Amino acid sequence: MNSEKASIESARTALITLSDEGAALVERLCSILDNRLIFLHANVDPRFSGKRFERLLDISGNIFSSFRNIVFIGPTGVAVRAFGRLASHKTIDPAIVVVDVCARYVISLLSGHEGGANDLAIVVANHLDAEPVITTTTEARKDLIVGVGCRKAVQSSVIVEAITSTLSMEGLDMSRVRFIASADIKKTESGLVDAARFLGIPLRFVSSREITRKHYAFEISDLVYSQFGLPGVAEPSAILAGRRTELIVPKRKSNGVTVAVARENCT
């Protein structure tokens, strides 16, 4: 399955929720998911638009067979009861992700690899400033996060070269990289998006608010601070995109690109 963001945005997607809070999140997701249909519980406030349902179990079968992607905003247990009985095989089941109503977590629930739920979870999490929860073993074993900052309009090939050369010089294998991470101010940098796509590595954005809130012992970039009010991009993004991280490669600058590497302690 094509894991490119553009493919996710154009895929037929069902957005489902049981609550007003969930409906507000659905509205936010509509801006990035073009080919979507909204399903709202009958008790959701009438100001929200969407097809209404009384019982999720009554419509889950049709949704499961009709959509490539399913985003359910509500309790994971409800999603499991509604869709779990319908699962057949990872090569044909739709991608299902679950989001809590406060947008803290986006869980890749079904068809993580073949169905694209892992990629979908990251796209949704980036947009909602949430934490993607991906438990497939291949991804879980990866322990490196590459933080990247770049000058505006830098070509993807330059970013790819900066990442690959940094990892090579440090004797680090690309297969260990779980995320390429950057600050949310870089979301529209096509060179960065294309570089991550070329390398086949998920691109994770860290909120500027989170970067300014945390204090770590890394070198402050005067340029980044003067332009964006941030202490840096590459190092804090690498650290904050993971859990129990330590910076193992301090930032390195090359041709308008800054790269840093953090390692997660997974033991």
Stretch-by-stretch model annotation:
Residues L128, F198-L199, R243:
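Short, structured coil segments at secondary-structure junctions
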Residues L18-G191, G256-T267:
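Conserved mixed alpha/beta catalytic, RNA-binding, or beta-rich assembly cores of soluble enzyme
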